[in-house]
């Protein structure tokens, strides 16, 4: 997609995207955050470019070693939701035209294995 070669996987370059982002166990496993990126560039205050919509810092919402997680990301009925092990952590109404159907998994300084990974149209699951 546009400018992906320029971004080159550098985290700071993600500021230029218009997206929602969950950082689960970020900041050396000190925070779990939900952010909305507004597609701005450098020199703009981070709180304006990528405001934190909700944040957890308690141990129950940080990564645990040797634990298999069930993650569900859903976009339906005008909202996007993120649930971990059956607990809905984040939910946000999404305006028409917001979001373009892309999602990504970004992994950094961790050891991750995926099992039973699925992407599905919710209408086909009903």
Regions found by a protein language model. Give the residues of each.
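Extracellular glycan-recognition regions
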Residues: 1-126
């Amino acid at each position: 997609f546009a400018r992906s070669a320029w971004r080159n996987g550098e985290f700071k370059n993600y500021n230029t995207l218009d997206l929602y982002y969950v950082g689960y166990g970020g900041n050396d496993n000190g925070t779990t955050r939900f952010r909305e990126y507004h597609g701005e560039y450098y020199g703009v205050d981070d709180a304006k470019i990528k405001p934190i919509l909700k944040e957890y810092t308690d141990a129950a919402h940080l990564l645990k070693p040797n634990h298999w997680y069930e993650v569900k990301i859903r976009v339906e009925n005008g909202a996007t939701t993120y649930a971990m092990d059956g607990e809905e952590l984040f939910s946000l109404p999404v305006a028409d035209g917001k979001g373009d159907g892309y999602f990504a998994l970004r992994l950094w300084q961790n050891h991750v294995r995926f099992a039973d990974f699925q992407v599905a149209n919710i209408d086909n699951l009903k």
